[in-house]
């Protein structure tokens, strides 16, 4: 039981800014880390629902509530996945050979394409929440999206565990070596099944389309990782997580209008 608690602490310490008690980053304490990774999405989803509910309940201006909703994931995670999105965008846009792309991922400087990607990413989120935060009925769509923050992390964890690694000495490779691959993968698959059921239960068509969209983006992630990098890395995993979430959000923004 203590080992599971330590794995929980390591997962939250690594992938969020939520204060956690100290835990040694040993192999035993990282073995089941990915089993707890999706629960960071639970926190983001819960806060998203809370902000949306309070915004409707107390009549705050839609623009203000929308801005807060956009920033919730950044506040919870510290932007760790957005960093991966921007680094990967720079690498993909360079059109260099594979080894050079991997070097760009490690470069701490933001290129022009990273800046453009950041602007597009946050504007897309603002547009989505502007569309969704316009009626109590659309709280169902926000509810589906809140579960989507867990779906993206389940798929991201499965990718880290099962995809080839682009670098043998990277963070993802280290996490994968220390994790219990089969058990963690199976737990994440069970989570996915339950989350898909929950999304469909809230609103069958909306939930189904959002979940299928996430799976298609996961396929695209695998394609990009293998074709351009020879495997996945922490940055590419963050890239996937960001486009998966905003992709589900865009789908919900469109279908909720019908």
What are these model-predicted stretches?
Residues 22, 57-61, 134-136, 161-169, ...:
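Transmembrane helix-loop junctions in multipass membrane proteins, especially transporters and channels
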Residues 75, 79, 105, 120-161, ...:
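Selected alpha-helical membrane-embedding segments in polytopic membrane proteins
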Residues 47, 51-55, 72, 76, ...:
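Alpha-helical membrane-inserting segments
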Residues 35-89, 142-148, 206-227:
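Membrane-embedded alpha-helical segments that form the functional core of polytopic membrane enzymes
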């Amino acid at each position: 039981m203590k080992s599971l608690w330590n794995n929980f602490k390591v997962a939250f310490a690594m992938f969020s800014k939520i204060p956690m008690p100290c835990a040694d980053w040993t192999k035993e304490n990282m073995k089941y880390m990915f089993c707890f990774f999706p629960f960071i999405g639970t926190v983001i989803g819960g806060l998203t629902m809370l902000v949306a509910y309070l915004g409707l309940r107390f009549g705050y201006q839609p623009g203000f509530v929308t801005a807060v909703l956009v920033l919730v994931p950044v506040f919870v995670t510290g932007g760790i996945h957005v960093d991966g999105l921007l680094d990967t965008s720079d690498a993909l846009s360079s059109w260099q050979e594979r080894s050079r792309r991997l070097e760009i991922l490690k470069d701490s400087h933001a290129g022009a394409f990273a800046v453009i990607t950041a602007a597009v990413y946050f504007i897309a989120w603002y547009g989505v929440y502007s569309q969704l935060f316009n009626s109590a009925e659309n709280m169902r769509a926000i509810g589906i999206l809140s579960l989507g923050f867990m779906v993206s992390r389940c798929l991201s964890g499965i990718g880290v565990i099962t995809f080839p690694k682009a670098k043998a000495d990277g963070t993802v490779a280290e996490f994968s070596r220390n994790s219990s691959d089969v058990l963690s993968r199976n737990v994440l698959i069970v989570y996915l099944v339950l989350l898909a059921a929950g999304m469909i239960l809230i609103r069958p068509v909306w939930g189904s389309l959002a979940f299928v969209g996430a799976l298609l983006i996961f396929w695209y992630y695998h394609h990009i990782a293998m074709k351009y990098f020879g495997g996945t890395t922490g940055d590419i995993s963050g890239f996937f997580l960001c486009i998966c979430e905003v992709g589900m959000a865009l789908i919900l923004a469109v279908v909720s209008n019908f």
